[in-house]
Amino acid sequence: MKLENHNLAVASLKTQRISAFKARLVAVLLKGKKVSDALAILAHTKKKASPIFTKLINSAVANAINNHGFEHSNLIIKAAIVNEGPTLKRFRPRAKGAASQILKRTSHFKVILVSQNGGESQNQEYQETEKNLVTKSPENTQSGALSQQSQAEQPQNDPENGVDSQLSAKTNSTTTAKKTDLADNSTKNDATNTVLAQEKEVK
């Protein structure tokens, strides 16, 4: 189970051989109590769930001290949760070949501890890590998207410009070729005219 608040310490036990109804009778006594008071209550409560909760609270305290750096005297039980687990089905023989069903119930336990001081140092570290993870603001992402769109549009327009330049180059080459052909034809006509004029003079 993931918790957003990093000021919490959690410990859990699963498939304990006790019904959820009987375990909740003890869980009600622990909510909102200090850890020292809760352990004292469990020591004087003669219920099957008492040693289970004692073991679970000690585990949660160890997690709070080692993982979060909390002090033992500042820990409070925020929640003591008991959920139903899988049920084992057994049968008891009865008279005349009959059998009756036996339901052996199990339960899942969870204890959540919180510090009275709120763990300000842990909150600051968590906020710093969040700031490091946030690399771009929404405005930067929008500007980046626009720049990507413009970059994507530029290569699409470039081929069209290239085609236009190729067409203009082809037209220019054809016009220059036509001009050179006309110039060659004019020079040939001038040469033939001069030859004819010389022949007439000779005659």
Swiss-Prot record:
It comes from the Bacteria. Residues 138-203 are annotated as: Disordered. GO terms for cellular component: cytosolic large ribosomal subunit. Pfam families: Ribosomal_L22. Residues 138-167, 183-196 have a biased composition (Polar residues). Residues 168-177 have a biased composition (Low complexity). Keywords: Ribonucleoprotein, Ribosomal protein, RNA-binding, rRNA-binding. The keyword rRNA-binding applies. One of its GO terms (molecular function) is rRNA binding. Gene3D superfamilies: Ribosomal protein L22/L17. One of its GO terms (biological process) is translation. The keyword Cell cycle does not apply. CDD domains: Ribosomal_L22 (cd00336). Part of the 50S ribosomal subunit. PANTHER family: CHLOROPLAST 50S RIBOSOMAL PROTEIN L22-RELATED (PTHR13501), LARGE RIBOSOMAL SUBUNIT PROTEIN UL22M (PTHR13501:SF8). Belongs to the universal ribosomal protein uL22 family. This protein binds specifically to 23S rRNA; its binding is stimulated by other ribosomal proteins, e.g. L4, L17, and L20. It is important during the early stages of 50S assembly. It makes multiple contacts with different domains of the 23S rRNA in the assembled 50S subunit and ribosome. The globular domain of the protein is located near the polypeptide exit tunnel on the outside of the subunit, while an extended beta-hairpin is found that lines the wall of the exit tunnel in the center of the 70S ribosome. This is Large ribosomal subunit protein uL22. It comes from Mesomycoplasma hyopneumoniae (strain 7448) (Mycoplasma hyopneumoniae). The gene is rplV.
